[in-house]
């Protein structure tokens, strides 16, 4: 719950304007991010915090994600080193849960978004 609240707060404040997911972890029929899509961001309790619209979608290998993208993710000290360390832990656990092996060349979906609506329910 805490991490959900923290991430939603970063998005609402306009600090977090990007996110990354691992392409290989999507289910076969699961929709991938695409430009123009609207997303409801939930807080840690599952309540709507805001609505975002996807502006940019790129598929980039994990080890090629840029410092600029890491900065726009808005987490920690916003450095590429922080981004890599945190996403490495997250992706390793996610890949292990799917009985797959993580490697640094995995394709990542790097998404940039803007906030188009903020919930007034806090």
Where are each of the predicted segments found?
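Compositionally biased, charged N-terminal/linker segments
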Residues: 1-26
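Short, surface-exposed secondary-structure edge patches
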Residues: 27-32
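Loop/turn positions that initiate beta-strands
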Residues: 35-42
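Short polar/acidic secondary-structure junctions
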Residues: 44-46
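Short beta-strand-centered aromatic/proline hotspots
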Residues: 49-58
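Short, solvent-exposed secondary-structure boundary/capping segments
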Residues: 60-71
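Contiguous surface segments at macromolecular interaction interfaces
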Residues: 77-122
């Amino acid at each position: 719950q805490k991490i959900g609240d923290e991430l939603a707060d970063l998005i609402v404040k306009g600090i977090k304007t990007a996110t990354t997911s691992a392409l290989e972890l999507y289910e076969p029929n699961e929709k991938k991010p695409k430009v123009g899509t609207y997303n409801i961001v939930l807080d840690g309790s599952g309540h709507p915090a805001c609505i975002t619209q996807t502006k940019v979608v790129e598929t980039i290998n994990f080890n090629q994600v840029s410092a600029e993208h890491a900065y726009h993710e808005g987490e920690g000290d916003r450095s590429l080193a922080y981004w890599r360390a945190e996403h490495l832990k997250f992706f390793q656990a996610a890949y292990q849960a799917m009985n797959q092996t993580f490697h640094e060349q995995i394709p990542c979906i790097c998404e940039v978004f803007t906030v188009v609506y903020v919930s007034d329910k806090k």
